[in-house]
Amino acid sequence: MVRTPLSPEQVAAGRRLGAALRAARGARTLEDVARGAGISPETLRKIETGRLPSPAFGTIVGLSDVLDLPLETLAEVWRPVSAAAS
């Protein structure tokens, strides 16, 4: 299956998502949060740094659960800045 390249807006959204997840992680270790979400620490590292700007929905659900962040909050972070402002 061929993936369509992400638009610059989607890449920027991925960076915002990663930054929000990193902030929510706080003092918790990357390893502990990754384990709780059922993903590898490397996957979480890539998401937090924006190198994986479009993670799987199940990954986001797991991170939402372990970080006690509502999915709606993460969706707001992901939405384009112009859409969030309207």
Name each model feature, range by range:
Residues 26-46:
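Short alpha-helical DNA-recognition segment
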Residues 2-3, 75-86:
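Short, charged recognition helix plus adjacent turn
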Residues 1-27, 72:
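A short, Lys/Arg-rich alpha-helix, primarily the initiator
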Residues 51-56, 82-85:
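Short, solvent-exposed alpha-helical "recognition" segments
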Residues 22, 31-32, 61:
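Residues within the helices of the helix-turn-helix
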Residues 27-29, 55-58:
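Residue-level signal for the short linker/turn that defines the boundary of a DNA-recognition helix
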Residues 19, 23, 46, 65, ...:
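DNA-binding alpha-helical recognition surfaces that contact promoter or target DNA
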Residues 58-74:
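DNA major-groove recognition helix of helix-turn-helix/homeodomain DNA-binding modules
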